[in-house]
Every structure is written in C-alpha cells, then in structure tokens.
C-alpha cells in the first residue's frame, strides 16, 4: 500500500511549516490514513457525481470525430456509475505484499444494477458481466448466446451474464513457461523503501507550501478537513520535485514535463475529507471547475471507506480454460466465415472472367 504510506506521510508533514490549524489537520489525517493501513479488510466505494449534460459537454470539448460522440445511453450509464472494491489480507494492509492478499472483489454498477463484477479468491478468478447493457452503452450490441455454435463452449455462459471462473495459477505458470522460452521474464517494476521515502519527502515539501488545510465540524459527530490548492501550480511543482528521482523509479515510469502541463487549468480544487471518531470515512472532490466549461455543471468524485467484508467465491461458477475460450471464439468466427459459400466463390470466378 505504497500510496497510503506516501499519502499519510505527506499529510502529516504538510503541517510542519503551517499554522496551528494546519498542524491539527495534518496530524488528524495522518492518524486516519494510519488506521486504514492497519486494517486487514477494507472496502472502497467510488461514485462519479455528474449528469448527462455535463458528460456531453465534456465530450464536445474534446472535439470527437463525427460519429465518435459519446452515445446518450453511455452518458446515462456513466453518470451514476459506482465502483466498489474490497480487499482482504492475512496481514495489516500497510505491511502486505502481493502474496498476502487472500481475497479481492470489484464491482461496477449503476441505478439499473450490476454491470460487471470480478473476484479473486485463492488461485481462482471469478468474472461476470451484463453484456446486453454494456453493449448498448458502447453502441455495439453483444451477440446472443443462443446464436453461438457448440464450439463456443463457456463463451455462452459469459454472454449470458453467468459467473465463470479460471485458475490464475495455471495461467501464470503457462505465461512463465512462454517467457522462459523467449529468454526469461522481464523484471517486475518495484519501488524500494528508500525510493518511497525520497518520494514522500519530496511530495511532503510541496504539499506543505502549496496546500491550504482547514477544519470544520460536521453532522453526527463528524469532522471535515478541506485541502485546497491551484491545480496546475500544484501538479507542476509536484512533478518538478519528483523529476530528479526518475533514475530511482521503475523502468517505464515517464513523468510529464512542464510543457505537458502548461495548458492544465490553474483553478483551485478542494478535497473534503470526512472523519468520524478519528477514522477517514469519505473524500469528496469537485472537479467541475477544472473543465473550464460553463455547461459542465456537475462533475465530482466521492470515495467512501469502510471496514469491508470478506470476499467470497460465488456458487455454481462455470470453470473455463482461457485457451478453450479463445478456441471457441475463433471457432465461432470461422463458422461465420464458412457461410461464405461455394456460390460466393463462383461469383468471384465469374468476376475474374469478366475482367
């Protein structure tokens, strides 16, 4: 949980050069992030707080090519989308490595229901999705399961929105065997503890100078801490402070240049942290001002935290072999190609004779 560790250090240090209010706010947020890291199960819920008109205005500002505009159906689905993530570890999350996590679940939903869900329990991954709804959202309807040939196998269950599962350990072993045949796997990107500390110190120094913290009492015993900063100034100075550490970062991590960031809006953005009994329960960020578009009336993100529940394996999931699934997919495609009949070939021969 590098991000949690860095965020905690940043928020604590941000008060060091500030007022008494800065000191109090930074200390409280530091403790709140520290409590999150000590949990073994944790759930996050991310809500996109927007509306169709704002999404359409944002899309229009990007000047899409004719025909590539966001469909109304997609805007409606995205406008109230929610992403829920739960994790479970054998150790406190702040001390956990990849092998310590024993369960993970992620779900994407909206007012109409669940759109897609993914769970990782032990060596198995479980997946299901509402392809009918997703197809409408993308403007490209999914094929009907009953229209698929027998060779499609488990692909039918996938399209019907049923739970399917596959063995991730077997997939990793197969991938490793392929990498060995090609000369060995590439080293995985890592961020060592020394580099993490350098990053935290660099970011903390900028936050202390550029971010304004304030505290206020809320309802039902909650407390609100707001952090406000001009967006372009903050991110430009953040990346400027981090850039000298590039040589210590994992390969492939490229940082944006000042030139890349010069057109970013410098509007002030505020994050509102909600604490209850000292625990961080919610973060709200209003991004509408960053759009610099009067038609974007509503564009916010809300992140809610809770203790979480243990992810469980769904019952009656159909086991599939990814290779068999691909064979079924290509088999279905070949079946469609087979419909290119002998009469079609005869027509081609005729066309050649006419040349």
What is the role of each PLM region?
Residues 1-6:
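N-terminal export and membrane-targeting signals
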């Amino acid at each position: 949980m590098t991000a949690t560790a860095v965020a905690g250090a940043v928020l604590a240090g941000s008060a060091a050069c500030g007022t008494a209010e800065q000191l109090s706010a930074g200390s409280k947020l530091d403790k709140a992030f520290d409590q999150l890291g000590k949990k073994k199960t944790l759930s996050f819920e991310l809500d996109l707080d927007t509306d169709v008109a704002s999404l359409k205005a944002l899309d229009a500002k990007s000047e899409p090519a004719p025909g590539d505009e966001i469909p109304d159906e997609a805007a409606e689905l995205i406008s109230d989308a929610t992403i829920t993530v739960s994790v479970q570890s054998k150790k406190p999350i702040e001390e956990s490595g990849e092998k310590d996590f024993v369960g993970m679940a992620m779900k994407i939903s909206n007012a109409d229901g669940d759109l897609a869900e993914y769970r990782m329990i032990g060596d198995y991954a479980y997946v299901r999705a509402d392809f009918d709804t997703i197809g409408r959202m993308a403007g490209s309807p999914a094929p009907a399961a009953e229209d698929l040939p027998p060779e499609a196998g488990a692909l039918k269950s996938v399209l019907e929105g049923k739970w399917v599962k596959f063995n991730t350990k077997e997939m990793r072993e197969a991938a490793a065997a392929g990498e060995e045949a090609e000369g060995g796997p590439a080293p995985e990107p890592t961020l060592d503890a020394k580099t993490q500390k350098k990053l935290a110190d660099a970011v903390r120094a900028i936050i202390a100078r550029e971010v304004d913290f304030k505290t206020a009492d809320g309802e039902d015993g909650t407390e609100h801490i707001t952090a406000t900063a001009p967006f372009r100034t903050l991110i430009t100075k953040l990346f400027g402070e981090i850039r000298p550490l590039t040589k210590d970062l994992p390969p492939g991590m490229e940082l944006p240049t000042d030139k890349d960031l010069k057109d970013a809006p410098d509007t002030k953005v505020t994050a509102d942290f909600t604490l209850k009994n000292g625990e961080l329960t919610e973060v709200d960020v209003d991004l509408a001002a960053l759009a610099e578009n009067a038609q974007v009336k509503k564009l916010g993100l809300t992140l809610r935290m809770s203790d979480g529940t243990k992810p469980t394996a769904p019952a009656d999931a159909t086991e599939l072999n990814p290779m068999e699934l691909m064979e079924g997919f290509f088999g279905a495609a070949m079946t469609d190609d087979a419909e290119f009949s002998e009469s079609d070939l005869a027509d081609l021969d005729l066309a050649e004779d006419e040349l």
